[in-house]
Amino acid sequence: MDKPRVRFAPSPTGYLHIGGARTALFNWLWARRNGGTFVLRIEDTDRERSTQLAVDAILDGLRWLGLDWDEGPGVGGPHPPYFQTERLDLYKAHAERLIREGKAYACYCTREELDAQRKQAEAEKRQFRYPGTCRDEPYDPSRPHVVRFRVPDAGATSWNDLVKGVISTPHDTLQDEVILRGDGVPLYNFGAVVDDITMEINLVGRGDDHVNNTARQILMYEALGYPVPTFAHFPMILGADKARLSKRHGATSVTAYRDLGFLPQAVVNYLVRLGWSHGDQELFTLDELVRYFDLKDVGATAGVFNLEKMAWVNHEWLKRLSPEELAKLALPHFRAAGLPAEDDEKLRHVCAVARERAKTLGEYVQQFRYFYAPIALDPKAKAKFLTADTRPVLQAVRDAIAALPALETQAVEQVFHGEAERRGVGLGKVAQPARVALTGGTASPGMYDVVQILGKDETLRRLDEAIRVAGQPG
């Protein structure tokens, strides 16, 4: 069996989204497992919607996920160029060859004529199919025209899909579709076939929304006289309501998840499990995925995207990292929020306590910004815990911390336990007022962690401010 040559061919009309990223991942894994080649091709023929910004975002997203390409933009390869708009001569040459051989023909029908036929079909409540008006017209390249592919009148086209099994499409359900517009730009099916032929792609892995294109493309391969590649159509990714995945389900671009603080290995890990499994194992490194992944194990049932589950996977990966590793990853997120964090012992301590509590690096910032910014007292917490009755408690805690020669864990813990014992109350009666004073709210890591991270000077300053406002309205 030849080594696989697979491709990912996104359209740069938007960012790299979840479905596209999984398609790229499955192809990349198959190529890497089998010593094959992963080709990146940019299908930019929609000139009105394609942008360089989107191209850059797609490349950036793939790099962030760790999906390097062997041929394509930025790395070259033996079958350039890798942008469709730079390959128009190829499409024209293949279309003209099909015309010469009677397998395609020039269609001179005007848009107005076709629109009238569509309206008539609609009025008669039947599906419009091009009636082959120009099938036998002589070719006159001087007349404005498009090129249509001549679909065989009888029979069916079948293929054995690696994921979905045997699929057959009767030819009488197809029409003579346009393959080349008047401006020389190919339509999707023809452009993909010519590119896959000239780039020697032997396995086409893509979403199963392309199943209906496959018979048309196989007919084009056969008409051009080239081997038909193997096809694998991956199941769709749906939202929780079983509708097609969209932003309202929490799905967004891959780079947006990066900016929210997801790790690339977590996103890869979650995406691969949307349609593929290996026993009961949940977490995989990229190396493990390359070792285990097999297209035969991709299911035909649609996967359901669950942002909470992806956050859980991300949390599991975060917990595998050391505070030192987490600090380097979290630092850009703190700085992006305008917080004066540094890659130092303070941030490493913050990450150590955040690791069990927060599921994304973005949540590190949301939950623990009070270590780097002035606190905003929660009104309900202030009213309940910063009162005239708790002012003496706060003062006692403040004085005890001020007297400590160093903020050793045991010594800081003893400040709170000792004050609770002295007053004959539970620890919460001492710790909660101090927690509100130091963090602004009622949920935080242990008080010894909070005090150590803030440092003595900032701890005393915040306690002094809490003592000042305790019992005051507002």
UniProtKB/Swiss-Prot annotation:
UniProt KW Metal-binding keyword: yes
Localization per Swiss-Prot or TrEMBL: Cytoplasm
A GO term from the CC aspect: cytosol
This protein's record includes keyword Repeat: no
Cofactor(s) it depends on: Zn(2+)
Known EC number: 6.1.1.17
Binding site for Zn(2+): C107, C109, C134, D136
'KMSKS' region (motif): residue ranges: 244-248
InterPro entries membership: aa-tRNA-synth_I_cd-bd, aa-tRNA-synth_I_codon-bd_sub2, aa-tRNA-synth_I_CS, aa_tRNA-synth_I_cd-bd_sf, Glu-tRNA-ligase_bac/mito, Glu-tRNA-synth_I_codon-bd_sub1, Glu/Gln-tRNA-synth, Glu/Gln-tRNA-synth_Ib_cat-dom
Note on cofactor: Binds 1 zinc ion per subunit.
SUPFAM superfamilies: An anticodon-binding domain of class I aminoacyl-tRNA synthetases, Nucleotidylyl transferase
Sequence motif 'HIGH' region, location on chain: 10-20
Catalysed reaction, written as an equation: tRNA(Glu) + L-glutamate + ATP = L-glutamyl-tRNA(Glu) + AMP + diphosphate
GO molecular function (one): zinc ion binding
Residues annotated to bind ATP: K247
UniProt GO BP: glutamyl-tRNA aminoacylation
One Pfam family, short name: tRNA-synt_1c
Keywords tagged on the record: Aminoacyl-tRNA synthetase, ATP-binding, Cytoplasm, Ligase, Metal-binding, Nucleotide-binding, Protein biosynthesis, Zinc
Quaternary state and interactors: Monomer.
Family per similarity comment: Belongs to the class-I aminoacyl-tRNA synthetase family. Glutamate--tRNA ligase type 1 subfamily.
UniProt cross-references to PANTHER family, sorted A to Z: GLUTAMATE--TRNA LIGASE, GLUTAMATE--TRNA LIGASE, MITOCHONDRIAL-RELATED
Function: Catalyzes the attachment of glutamate to tRNA(Glu) in a two-step reaction: glutamate is first activated by ATP to form Glu-AMP and then transferred to the acceptor end of tRNA(Glu).
HAMAP family cross-referenced by the UniProt entry: Glu_tRNA_synth_type1
Name of the featured protein: Glutamate--tRNA ligase
Protein source organism: Anaeromyxobacter dehalogenans (strain 2CP-C)
Gene label: gltX
